[in-house]
């Protein structure tokens, strides 16, 4: 077995083999080993991901995908227990931060053998059935503000203004966030290239404080994702955020509810979201709505 550095997006056959290996791991483990961005990075070299592959003959045994110091790593189901995970970790650059999606026992054991500790926890929370139907019946109207889809907003205010406001609001809402913060239009457009993107599933909260003849200000947005490939299909609160000047005014609830209504209209009986485990106010707010913790994803790293 060899550990090879490879530019996977430049070899589509190799990218497909890694995707198939990841799909088999997801079926076996019940959780995807690679997140959406790292899956996209297998084919899109604009993301600049590096890949370490454990190779034996023509077979890919395991994969480590790197974005700077952030790593997502997994071993194929049929080749676990052979030390491949350790070999991949040993080949990583110094001070990696390794995601363990689902924080499965094997990942925990590998991390502990390498003297790593959990430095970040990301929760998947879900709401379904009667709890979802009760939550989506809450009010969505806010005095002086209106909710419109991306399509409706572009028709009224123009694409340039809408997307500039979207980027500004996103960066104010997620100035602290390692993946979601610091976006520009190019990064936004990459996100909109996703096969699942639906402009009708992006909701904006607008403040037309200046009247009909001035451009409105975006107070918040709710970007939804419809998981049509799953059976049954379900919805996701992909990103929801408020602009800095609109926090603390009770606007998050109506904006979230509007998204839940949209997902129920599409036939969802379940909606999920991701939230940082240390964001206690948000976790408690989601629990009050009826969400509960369904999965946990962890980042492991060596302590300073």
Swiss-Prot record:
Positions binding 1D-myo-inositol 2-(L-cysteinylamino)-2-deoxy-alpha-D-glucopyranoside in this chain are 36, 179, 225, 236, 274
Q: Does the keyword Transferase apply?
A: yes
Q: Which GO terms describe its biological process?
A: mycothiol biosynthetic process
Positions of the N-acetyltransferase domain = 145-304
- CDD domains tied to this protein: NAT_SF
Q: Which PROSITE patterns match?
A: GNAT (PS51186)
Domain of life of the organism in this record? Bacteria
Q: Which InterPro entries match?
A: Acyl_CoA_acyltransferase, GNAT_dom, Mycothiol_AcTrfase
Regions crossing the membrane: none
Which residues hold acetyl-CoA 1?
73-75
Chemical reaction(s) catalysed:
1D-myo-inositol 2-(L-cysteinylamino)-2-deoxy-alpha-D-glucopyranoside + acetyl-CoA = mycothiol + CoA + H(+)
Q: Name one GO molecular function term.
A: mycothiol synthase activity
The EC number on file is: 2.3.1.189
Keywords assigned by UniProt? Acyltransferase, Repeat, Transferase
Which of this chain's residues are annotated to bind acetyl-CoA 2? 240-242, 279-284
Summarizing the function annotation, the protein's role is: Catalyzes the transfer of acetyl from acetyl-CoA to desacetylmycothiol (Cys-GlcN-Ins) to form mycothiol.
Q: What is the annotated quaternary arrangement, including any partners?
A: Monomer.
HAMAP family this protein is in? MshD
Q: Family per UniProt?
A: Belongs to the acetyltransferase family. MshD subfamily.
Output this protein's name.
Mycothiol acetyltransferase
Gene from which the chain derives? mshD
């Amino acid at each position: 077995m060899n550990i090879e550095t490879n530019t996977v997006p430049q070899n589509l056959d190799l990218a497909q083999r890694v995707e198939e290996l990841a799909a088999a791991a997801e079926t076996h483990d019940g959780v995807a080993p690679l997140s959406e961005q790292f899956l996209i990075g297998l084919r899109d070299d604009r993301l600049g991901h590096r890949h370490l592959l454990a190779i034996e003959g023509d077979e890919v045994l395991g994969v480590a995908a790197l974005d700077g110091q952030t790593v997502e790593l997994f071993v194929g189901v049929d080749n676990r227990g052979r030390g491949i995970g350790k070999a991949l970790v040993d080949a990583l650059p110094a001070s990696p931060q390794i995601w363990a999606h689902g924080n499965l026992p094997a990942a925990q054991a590998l991390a502990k053998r390498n003297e790593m500790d959990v430095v970040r926890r990301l929760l998947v929370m879900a709401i379904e059935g009667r709890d979802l139907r009760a939550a989506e019946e809450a009010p969505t109207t806010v005095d002086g503000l209106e909710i419109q889809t991306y399509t409706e907003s572009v028709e009224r205010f123009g694409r340039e203004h809408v997307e500039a406001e979207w980027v500004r609001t996103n960066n104010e809402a997620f100035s602290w966030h390692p993946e979601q913060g610091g976006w520009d239009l190019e990064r936004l457009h990459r996100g909109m290239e996703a096969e699942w993107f639906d402009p009708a599933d992006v909701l904006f909260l607008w403040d037309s404080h200046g009247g009909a003849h001035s451009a409105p200000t975006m107070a918040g947005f709710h970007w939804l994702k419809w998981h049509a490939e799953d059976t049954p299909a379900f919805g996701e609160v992909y990103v929801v955020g408020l602009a800095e000047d609109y926090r603390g005014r009770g606007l998050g609830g109506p904006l979230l509810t509007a998204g839940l209504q949209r997902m129920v209209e599409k036939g969802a009986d379940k909606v999920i979201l991701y939230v940082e485990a240390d964001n206690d106010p948000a976790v408690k707010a989601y629990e009050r709505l009826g969400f509960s913790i369904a999965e946990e994803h962890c980042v492991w790293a060596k302590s300073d």
